[in-house]
Amino acid sequence: MSETFEKQPETGGDYEPLGVAELFDHDDRGLRVRVGATTVEVTALAPDLFRVGMFPAGGPPRYDSEGVAKEDWGTVEVSMQESDEELTLSTTAATARVALNPLRIGFADSSGREFAVDDEELGMGSVETPGADVFSEPLGSPVRLYKRREAGERYFGCGERTSGLEKTGSHQVFYNVDPPLGHTASFNNLYSSIPFTFSITNGKAHGLFFDNTHRVEFDLALEDENRAYYGAEGGAIVYYVFCGPTPREVVDRYTELTGRTPMPPLWTLGNQQCRYSYMNEEEVREVARGFRERGIPCDVIYLDIHYMDGYRVFTWNEDRFPNPRRLISDLREQGFRVVTIVDPGVKVDENYSVYTEGRERDLYCKTREGEEYHNVVWPGVCAFPDFTNPETRGWWGENQRVLTDAGVAGIWCDMNEPALFIPHVSTLPDDVVHPGGRTGAPKRHAQIHNTYGSLMARAAREGLLALRPDERPFVITRAGYAGLQRHAMHWTGDNSSWWEHLWMSMPQLQNLALSGVAWAGVDVGGFGGDTNGELLARWTEFGVFQPYCRNHTTIGTRRQEPWAFGEPYESVCREMIKLRQRLLPYLYSLFDECHRTGAPILRPLLFEYPEDETTYTADDEFLLGDVLLVAPITRPGIEYRHVYLPEGTWFHYYSGERFEGPVHILAHAPLGEPALYVRGSSPIPMGPHAAHTGERPDDPLTLLVYPAKGKGESTLYEDAGNGFGYEEGEYARRRISCEVSDDHLTIRLGERQGSFVPERQEIRLELRGITTAQGVTVNDEEHAPDRVEGGALTVTLGEEATPTRVEVIL
């Protein structure tokens, strides 16, 4: 294990909380107080969003951050009250209370609920570090923030964590690393850092984003069960409080601040296949044939580092891939896209134009002595781009032309923590300098380490937009910081082909979802080590419900394409991937919701049921949207597992068995039939069977419903699947509801919003569990059902933009 993993904060001094404060300025949005030479600002950005900044002596307030996307907030109605003991800053939704002696800050909503209140004893402040290196002065002193834990407060979030949903009683480290292959759930910091806590107290939620890109640590009621601690090794204290009170409102406002997930190209939601590495053109063609001949849907094939010339980025190995343009064109005709890996390390080679151009333009990181910083990764000795420099990002993005001109559809950013090969130095040393270019100030690597991956992903996305302005970019990143979701989807790095890692994937993706990163996925089947048929099949049963579905494994392991282990596993993988392909209309509609509101796609049960404390520990089951509940098998040789179904009526997808929640059940989940449940009366839009997203079968869209007494709703969203016409209204969005009484069922398709017109002519309603019907009307006119068989009533409707009402007399 490298020194980076074991590193603990060394303050070398004493913590000093801020003392007596005095008001010295205020405006129509916030107030400023001074404690000696330190300035503290409290600002209302929105009725339910406050920002607090603590800036040391001589430091002007600065809030620019790679983690923040929105800086221009609309007018907020704010009132300030002042007394000798306290200042209050109130909006229509919440109040910030600023006690002056000593300075302590807390928040309360309009109902009086208190949250994010400073610890009375420790508050916030800094650690004096005498004898600091002059070169390190820009880093500043370590800073600390202590918050009181409310009675019953439970902590969640914290980004990419694998050890479970709840974080109460834990210590969290935020420092991006390339962890050792085979890490377990107890391993703390991984590839990305999102210093955001999501708290629930008595069913009410709030969030706290500690926006500091140095190494950060949280203690969430571990050392002291009555307080939480947020600290960084340098910089200022800047944090944002999201008042809630629902999880949906917290995540909505958090992603408004840090950035929404862009609408993806539709093809990126299809099944994807990767290996480190498909070594040459013929091997790639063989894999493509395997999918099409076996009838297993697939949209994307990846090229790992062996497509390059000596691992040099933005090159092709002419021996392995003599004509990449022709290969990619041929694959495109078969319905495949190709995505290529790109690492940040640039080989130091005088005969390599990418390296020499970057050197001539002074675009690389430096040593503290001003020399070009070098270290070792895949190509050997490398230089590392300074992605804090806008000129570097533009140059990097333009270099992608070598790939896009050959037809490459997306960029896979790897090794961007950044990871290094030299023993005991797993990433750039703290004193490496990022010059920042002509428009930026130089920064030490310690100041920006956690943002390096996000900045690389930003360069990739901006480059693709410049090279192909009419296409939605597809960028994958392994590393990043809060807000990475606006640049790329987050692949969670090198897992292992272990049952434990299958289980760890579920809390990992749910934690990311609560932290704003909804578009994420793990390697299906596991990356490190040999998988087996049962593990691959069970992992596929889980993987097809991820927002990102990709099978990937490392060099030297057994092949793990869906057919690698023969029957019955090939058939299980085929049918599960076919189910994902059919669910794409539902999945794409969830991406629309996520793009507009930040709502997670794969979400923990507590997101929808925060007042149900049983959901707080439901680590190994999850919701896809609010309609499907998935509970995968995560142990070998078993067919039964415990499932918790929250409030409402739920139906087993395969058998139609009905359950009234909240209820604990023992679910039967034989291989090929995972524990999958559908919320009653909630329509699921499903497409026809297809080999890839570009295939357009004649079969109509199906709205699948398991009717149950009461009312359920969902949304169907469609657009061209690529391009940016949807931003100009070229989309089709409609609400669909189902309402059931004792003898009556009503399906309503709301008016189609937007100017996009779907190509299909028909929509099919499939009402499962309906065995008899006395009559069917469509907009008050009698309508003969297609059939009542197999435990389902099927009704075919014309595709119309106007509202449609279907009545079924039971």
Predicted regions: what they are:
Residues R34-V35, F55, V76-P265, R275-Y276, ...:
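Catalytic and substrate-binding clefts that recognize carbohydrates or anionic sugar/phosphate headgroups
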Residues S2-F24, D28, T43-E85:
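A low-complexity, Ser/Thr/Gly/Pro-enriched, surface-exposed linker/loop concept
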Residues E283-L303:
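Catalytic domains of carbohydrate-active enzymes, especially glycoside hydrolases
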Residues V42, V52, T88-A93, L629-P632, ...:
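Short, well-ordered beta-strand segments enriched in hydrophobic/aromatic residues
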Residues R62-E77, Y653-L671, G775-L797:
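Solvent-exposed beta-strand/loop surfaces of large extracellular or lumenal domains
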Residues V42, F196, F291, L331, ...:
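Conserved, mostly hydrophobic/aromatic
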Residues T4, F55-A57, D64-G67, P297-C573, ...:
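Aromatic- and carboxylate-enriched substrate-binding clefts and catalytic-loop regions
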Residues E462-A466, D470-P473, G480-W491, M504-Q508, ...:
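Catalytic core of carbohydrate-active enzymes
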